[in-house]
Amino acid sequence: MSMGLEITGTSLAVLGWLCTIVCCALPMWRVSAFIGSSIITAQITWEGLWMNCVVQSTGQMQCKMYDSLLALPQDLQAARALIVVSILLAAFGLLVALVGAQCTNCVQDETAKAKITIVAGVLFLLAAVLTLVPVSWSANTIIRDFYNPLVPEAQKREMGTGLYVGWAAAALQLLGGALLCCSCPPREKYAPTKILYSAPRSTGPGTGTGTAYDRKDYV
């Protein structure tokens, strides 16, 4: 694997990791849907993993942490755990990638470095899946409730910026992890061993063994 490909894969994975952190912190997973009577509202509601915010038409914003975890929808409860695990897993993958990088001297064996880089790629792929699942789950819940006639219009939401950042983070980590997994251990080259065979010779002119070889020698 070339160093350029390794650096590209690591850079994409790190960028995806940073986007996951932004996705986790943004209080914009769900935003108010301006439909029906809510079009003339003077405030916008944002809902994230850790807090919800109310933005007034004057630009004033008030944010409040959630009082109870159990009061959150199931998709946001699961998203909290999965996103945090994804961030920690990607951070560990970054450390593993640095250990197995060709530009570092933590490991001298090239074969071991390639295997360590593959492990880092797998960790980034797992982190991408852990980010993709909760983001897609939340998006599916928002779309389902939006088209559900039983849900009041005031409670309907649209997809916020946090979900799009999460999808971008998952895509970057998938691409970066896949590039790192392309690191194949170098094949060891063995020189073919030459084995020389010598023809047996007879011990004397009268012996029966090796007469064919004796005749060939005298021709």
Curated annotation (Swiss-Prot):
Where is the signal peptide, in residue numbers? none
Please give the residue positions where the record annotates the modification Phosphoserine: 198
Q: What is its main location?
A: other
Of the GO CC terms on this record, one is:
lateral plasma membrane
Offer an example of a GO molecular function term for this protein: identical protein binding
The portions of this protein that span the membrane are: 9-29, 81-101, 116-136, 162-182
Pfam families the record matches: PMP22_Claudin (PF00822)
Membrane side Extracellular: residue ranges: 30-80, 137-161
The membrane topology noted for this protein in its Swiss-Prot or TrEMBL record is: Multi-pass membrane protein
UniProt xrefs under InterPro entries: Claudin, Claudin3, Claudin_CS, PMP22/EMP/MP20/Claudin
What does the record list as GO biological process?
actin cytoskeleton organization; bicellular tight junction assembly; calcium-independent cell-cell adhesion via plasma membrane cell-adhesion molecules; cell adhesion; cell junction assembly; cell junction maintenance; cell-cell junction maintenance; epithelial cell morphogenesis
User: What name appears for this protein in its UniProt entry?
Assistant: Claudin-3
Give the organism, scientific name: Rattus norvegicus
